[in-house]
Amino acid sequence: MQNQKTVKIGNIDVANDKPFTLFAGMNVLESRDLAMRMCETYVEITDRLGIPYVFKASFDKANRSSVHSYRGPGMEEGLKIFQELKDTFGVKIITDIHTEAQAQPVADVVDVIQLPAFLARQTDLVETMARTGAVINVKKPQFMSPDQVGNIVDKFAECGNENIILCERGSCMGYDNLVVDMLGFGVMKKVSNGSPIIFDVTHSLQNRDPSGKASGGRRSQTVELAKAGLATGIAGLFIEAHPTPDKALCDGPSALPLDQLEPFLKQMKALDDLIKGFEHIDIK
């Protein structure tokens, strides 16, 4: 069996052969009060279930389909909210950046910085992120095969940063649809020498109305897709929730209703424990 790397986020060990870590929160920071409420809910539930947890939110959705769509509060206000969440709940935080200038200021506050799928091949951004020394979550682009993510890992390694997590978020299937290749998880483990793989279930559920200006989604299938991913033996799940998904300011159609978070996580933990309790079968 290939050795699996462990990436440490504070006291959390993230690895494909360890209990899954939950990277979850809200798509975009809609308000300070909502962020506080949601983070408190996540922390209470994950503490109760014994699930390692990292809070996720974006301060700027720079790649919205429409110029009129809500993007977020911006970096300065977003980092203030993140710091308050850390001070209040003692939580680890992941957020995404889109420009080189954002890398160090964001890394000074949060625990994991995320390289967006649409920017994953931008070498200057990769180099700047690598130099922060932070843990990096790389979103696999929808247009990239699982084999090619090894090149991104190599770029970070050349810049001296091997604290890399890889995130599956679906692949383009024709126009306006995403599918998840379950064989891809094993391929990404192999080409990255055992780097932790996490599964962005929420964004893998996106689909689009060709005439629309925002992504649609299939949140009714969240449970089955998440279970399928965990069954491959991965390091974590990436989930976005909302108390009222139909009123969310971004990606509501794919968001898990917040009141269903605990029963969802109970099933995910039970499945992950089962899968990782099996003896590995190495088929050549």
Curated annotation (Swiss-Prot):
Annotated PANTHER family: PHOSPHO-2-DEHYDRO-3-DEOXYHEPTONATE ALDOLASE
Biological or metabolic pathway of the protein: Carbohydrate biosynthesis; 3-deoxy-D-manno-octulosonate biosynthesis; 3-deoxy-D-manno-octulosonate from D-ribulose 5-phosphate: step 2/3; Bacterial outer membrane biogenesis; lipopolysaccharide biosynthesis
Enzyme class: transferase
Pfam families named among the record's database cross-references: DAHP_synth_1
Catalytic activity: D-arabinose 5-phosphate + phosphoenolpyruvate + H2O = 3-deoxy-alpha-D-manno-2-octulosonate-8-phosphate + phosphate
Gene for this chain: kdsA
SUPFAM superfamilies in the cross-refs: Aldolase
Gene source species: Aliivibrio salmonicida (strain LFI1238) (Vibrio salmonicida (strain LFI1238))
GO MF annotation, one: 3-deoxy-8-phosphooctulonate synthase activity
Keyword Cell division tagged: no
GO cellular component terms, semicolon-separated: cytoplasm
Protein localization: Cytoplasm
Keyword Cytoplasm: yes
E.C. numbers: 2.5.1.55
Family affiliation: Belongs to the KdsA family.
First and last residue of the signal peptide: none
Protein name: 2-dehydro-3-deoxyphosphooctonate aldolase
GO annotation (BP), single: keto-3-deoxy-D-manno-octulosonic acid biosynthetic process
UniProt keywords, alphabetically: Cytoplasm, Lipopolysaccharide biosynthesis, Transferase
